UniProtKB/Swiss-Prot annotation:
Kappa-conotoxins inhibits voltage-gated potassium channels. This toxin dose-dependently and reversibly inhibits the Kv1.2/KCNA2 channel in mammalia. Does not exert protective effect on cardiac tissue when administered after an ischemic event. This is Kappa-conotoxin RIIIJ. Expressed by the venom duct. The modification 4-hydroxyproline is found at residues 2-3, 7-8, 13, 15, 21. The keyword Ion transport does not apply.
Length: 25
């Protein structure tokens, strides 16, 4: 999967993003 959080974000619309440390609140 492509990086869903670059740059790091506190919220990501993609379901898989919540599993990435950079996207966790």
């Amino acid at each position: 999967l492509p990086p869903c959080c670059t740059p790091p974000k506190k919220h990501c619309p993609a379901p898989a993003c919540k599993y990435k440390p950079c996207c966790k609140s």
